Swiss-Prot record:
Encapsidates the genome in a ratio of one protein N per nine ribonucleotides, protecting it from nucleases. If expressed without protein P it binds non-specifically RNA and therefore can bind it's own mRNA. Interaction with protein P abolishes any non-specific RNA binding, and prevents phosphorylation. The soluble N-P complex encapsidates specifically the genomic RNA, with protein N protecting the genome like a pearl necklace. The encapsidated genomic RNA is termed the nucleocapsid (NC) and serves as template for viral transcription and replication. It comes from Australian bat lyssavirus (isolate Bat/AUS/1996) (ABLV). GO terms for cellular component: helical viral capsid; host cell cytoplasm; ribonucleoprotein complex; viral nucleocapsid. Keywords: Capsid protein, Helical capsid protein, Host cytoplasm, Phosphoprotein, Ribonucleoprotein, RNA-binding, Superantigen, Viral nucleoprotein, Virion. This is Nucleoprotein. Phosphorylated by host CK2. Unphosphorylated protein N seems to have a better affinity for leader viral promoter encapsidation. Phosphorylation of protein N in ribonucleocapsid may stabilize the interaction with protein P, thereby playing an important role in viral transcription/replication. It is found in: Virion; Host cytoplasm. The modification Phosphoserine is found at residue 389. GO terms for molecular function: RNA binding. The keyword DNA-binding does not apply. Homomultimerizes to form the nucleocapsid. Binds to viral genomic RNA. In nucleocapsid, binds protein P and thereby positions the polymerase on the template. Protein P acts as a chaperone on free protein N to prevent it from aggregation before encapsidating genomic RNA. Coiled coil: none annotated. The gene is N. Belongs to the lyssavirus nucleocapsid protein family. InterPro entries: Rhabdo_ncapsid (IPR000448), Rhabdovirus_ncapsid_C (IPR023331), Rhabdovirus_ncapsid_N (IPR023330), Rhabdovirus_nucleoprotein-like (IPR035961).
């Protein structure tokens, strides 16, 4: 019988079947650009900028905006934000601009236009008798792009969180160098009338383009990023969490991965570090690949690397970090096992610093210190024949090497120690847990064991 089949009987008849499950039909797509062309979108005919401003502002005051017209205006307004490229700018082999070139957000991408006219003449704006200033254009652009940030705020945020964010954004765009163009609470009212701006591909594309530009080019109106910053590393929560994790525990990526004692990490680590990506390149298209439409399904999201994501946030919970306690558990990625490993790693890296003298009064004191430290190391390495130094190293609990941590987990039967459980309960029980959060998981799973 084939090794991938199972055998059983039905009504005394032998049956052999091959168990198969549904395969994820959506393949992860990496954002590498292979055709050497800038990311592109197609919009309607470019409007008269001043007429478009009046029409869009009128629609905003009435809390009724047409997404196509908004996108057409935002693309046309890019010409107002000219800046100087600080360095040669390339990404995925594409030359974006040379050092010293005058550039606008439109330089970063390819915006194609059709002959389809927008509904500018029908959308009002007759009450504006003068043409807007650049400061007023900048305020409108900033307010429109802020609809993206508001639409990305999770419903799990309680109270008036979103309203407070909207109010602070309005305050930014009514003070210099911007100009007040709307009444208080207009932004939130407009958002409520259409709360799904982040799902509109062209709007997302333009938000990412503006953010990529203002993140690199020093500009008078760089505060526009307040509404677009959420496009940076969008759908990269797995990779972003891993980056924060290694900084937190003061290890390199290579050193940290040596502590990932589970077979399900293998595929995720391979996925996260696919060759050919510009994950470590500043100002790359990679940073905004999701908003620029370069990937339909991110291989760096929390769902794509769920075991890594779960482990990192269980360690964060052990350390009492609010962000980790509030994060959503990936329930399909072995949360119980990840909580065990997270407990051991949390114990190793929580409240244990690595300290050494680095500054001295003079060169002689430095040399004396180095000589004394070298002598200590020689003595520590000397084997007096009475103790197996290898066993002592791994069983004493005084080392945090991957081998030592793994040995301690195995010696405890792959289970958490009572001290781990007490710590988990201590941090999670004092936290107002959100549905499906790590705090809720720890409370439900370990409260009876404390």
């Amino acid at each position: 019988m084939e090794s991938d089949k199972i055998a059983f009987k039905i009504n005394n008849q032998l049956v052999s079947v091959k168990p198969e499950v549904i395969v994820d039909q959506y393949e992860y797509k990496y954002p590498a650009i292979k055709d050497q062309r800038k990311p592109s979108i197609t919009l309607g005919k470019a409007p008269d900028l001043n007429k478009a401003y009046k029409s869009i502002l009128s629609g905003m005051n009435a809390a009724k905006l047409d997404p196509d017209d908004v996108c057409s205006y935002l693309a046309a307004a890019m010409e107002l934000f000219e800046g100087i490229c600080p360095e040669d700018w390339t990404s995925y082999g594409i030359l974006i601009a040379r050092k010293g070139d005058k550039i606008t957000p439109a330089t970063l991408v390819d915006i194609r236009r059709t002959d389809i006219q927008g509904s500018w003449a029908l959308a009002g704006g007759q009450d504006f008798t003068r043409d807007p200033t650049i400061a007023e254009h900048a305020s409108l652009v900033g307010l429109l792009l802020s609809l993206y940030r508001l639409s990305k705020i999770s419903g799990q945020n309680t109270g008036n969180y979103k309203t407070n964010i909207a109010d602070r954004i309005e305050q930014i765009f009514e003070t210099a160098p911007f100009a007040k163009i709307v009444e208080h609470h207009t932004l939130m009212t407009t958002h409520k009338m259409c709360a799904n701006w982040s799902t509109i591909p062209n709007f997302r594309f333009l938000a990412g383009t503006y953010d990529m530009f203002f993140s690199r080019v020093e500009h008078l109106y760089s505060a526009i990023r307040v509404g677009t910053v959420v496009t940076a590393y969008e759908d990269c929560s797995g990779l972003v969490s891993f980056t924060g994790f290694i900084k937190q525990i003061n290890l390199t990526a290579r050193e940290a991965i040596l502590y990932f004692f589970h077979k399900n990490f293998e595929e995720e680590i391979r996925r996260m570090f696919e060759p050919g990506q510009e994950t470590a390149v500043p100002h790359s298209y990679f940073i905004h690949f999701r908003s620029l439409g370069l990937s339909g399904k991110s291989p760096y999201s929390s769902n794509a690397v769920g075991h890594v994501f779960n482990l990192i946030h269980f360690v964060g919970c052990y350390m009492g970090q609010i962000r980790s306690l509030n994060a959503t558990v990936i329930s399909t990625c072995a949360p119980h096992e990840m909580s065990v490993l997270g407990g051991y790693l949390g114990e190793e890296f929580f409240g244990k610093g690595t300290f050494e003298r680095r500054f001295f009064r003079d060169e002689k004191e430095l040399q004396d210190y180095e000589a004394a430290e070298a002598m200590k190391i020689d003595l520590a390495l000397a084997d007096d024949g009475t103790v197996n130094s290898y066993d002592e190293d791994y069983l004493s609990g005084e080392t945090r090497s991957p081998e030592a941590v793994y040995t301690r987990i195995m010696m405890n039967g792959g289970r958490l120690k009572k001290s781990h459980i007490r710590r988990y309960i201590s941090v999670s029980s004092n936290h107002q847990s959100r549905p499906n959060s790590f705090a809720e998981f720890l409370n439900k799973t370990y409260s009876s064991d404390s």
